[in-house]
Amino acid sequence: YVQAYFEYDGKKSGGVTKSHLRFGDEPIRSSYLVRHADFVACHNKAYVANYDMVSDLKDGGSFLLACDWADVAALDAHLPVAMRRAIAQKHINLYVIDSVAIAAELGLGNRTNTILQAAFFHITGIIPDDKAVEYMKAAALKSYGKKGEKVVNMNYAAVDRGICGAVKIDYPASWAELTDETPAPRKDVPEFVTKIMEPVNNMHGDELPVSAFVGLEDGTWPQATSKYEKRGVAVKVPAWDASKCVQCNLCSYVCPHAAIRPFLLTEEE
């Protein structure tokens, strides 16, 4: 028996999706989201700075982080203090896997799902690794068989790399004693951003009291707030090469966020 619930944010490409999965030998009648998880995976390393992903993990649970931080020193530099402390206090089994690099090496672009799914089966041990590989390769053949042998083989390789690619981190016990850092004061940031927009973007909107919206009863929100929500979720960021630009303006035309704004000017202007 399998049950799945999903949470989404309001963004388009690169938005946050939370998948709540339960499975077992008996019918599942839990009509609520998972709040005591045995396994949690974070598929984008940028999320560690904004989202609380370990508070719902059981003591002794497993946390898989897709990142290129392969040792304790790198994790010390990038993981928030609260996350490291919770990991140590709950005796969480911490794993990392550089799924982005593996996908790029195999020619899969930014498609890391197969790699991370294989890592999930290996870490949880719900079925033997050889059976997981067998079932996943059968699913890949069914899904991608029409796209040719090359695509199928790339997904086969992704399964093989994912099943053995996760590295367990032996973090120091001192993580459990870490104290919170004092956040640096932020200047010129509107109260609306800190009290409403950022909690909503960090998936804590349900916790806001009604009093937080005093003055916004008609549903209107301030304008020009997108500059405060740079998510940093992209693996690669494009750069404009002036020497190759023919000024066709197609980039601006297709951009849904008006990130590129062309101006038609004369030499004098």
Language model features with spans:
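Short cysteine clusters
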Residues: 162, 240, 245-251, 255
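Intrinsic disorder at enzyme termini
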Residues: 172-229, 233-238, 267
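Iron-sulfur cluster-binding cysteine motifs and their immediate structural context
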Residues: 224-226, 250-269
